[in-house]
Regions:
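Glycine-rich beta-alpha loop elements in corrinoid/cobalamin-binding modules
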Residues: 31, 40-122
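Glycine- and acidic-residue-enriched helix-capping/strand-helix junction motifs
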Residues: 12-25
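N-terminal cofactor/phosphate-binding cores enriched in small/glycine residues
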Residues: 25, 31-32
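A near-ubiquitous, low-amplitude feature marking generic local secondary-structure context
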Residues: 11, 15, 62-65
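Extreme N-terminal starter segment of soluble prokaryotic enzymes
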Residues: 1-4
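Short loop/turn segments at strand-loop or loop-helix junctions that form parts
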Residues: 6-10
């Protein structure tokens, strides 16, 4: 199984060299590899352009998007585009940028219908 984890950043105000892979998706990769060893190939992305290039080269079975207030709109646009271009890819999102109220969560998922699953804590 091919998996892409992405914690995307806006690239218009920074150089690519300064986009370090975030610890959060690094931890996810490490955990998944301990559980599934050789059954999964995981790639990590910070730059949205590199993510899209990788999709066109070899689309993954699963895309995990790390969701924060500073990248929610970027995730929305990239996720919608990916689902349109690569409908077989399952998209999972998660992170602290999710409202506690059930009605807000439902509204979020309706707006983000490209997301198959959203992982919340609590």
């Amino acid at each position: 199984m091919l998996v892409y984890f992405a914690d995307l950043a806006h690239t218009y105000s920074t150089r690519n060299e300064s986009l370090m892979v975030p610890l959060n998706i690094g931890y996810l990769k490490s955990y998944v590899l301990t559980q599934h060893k050789n059954n999964v190939d995981i790639k990590l992305f910070k730059d949205p352009n590199k993510l899209l290039k990788a999709f066109y080269k070899k689309p993954p079975d699963l895309l995990g998007l790390s969701n924060y207030s500073w990248n929610e709109d970027l995730n929305f646009k990239i996720g919608k585009f990916i689902k349109m271009e690569f409908p077989r890819t399952t998209i999972i999102s998660g992170g602290p940028n999710m409202d506690d109220k059930t009605e807000h969560r439902i509204d979020f998922l309706k707006k983000n219908d490209h997301i198959s699953y959203y992982i919340v804590d609590g």
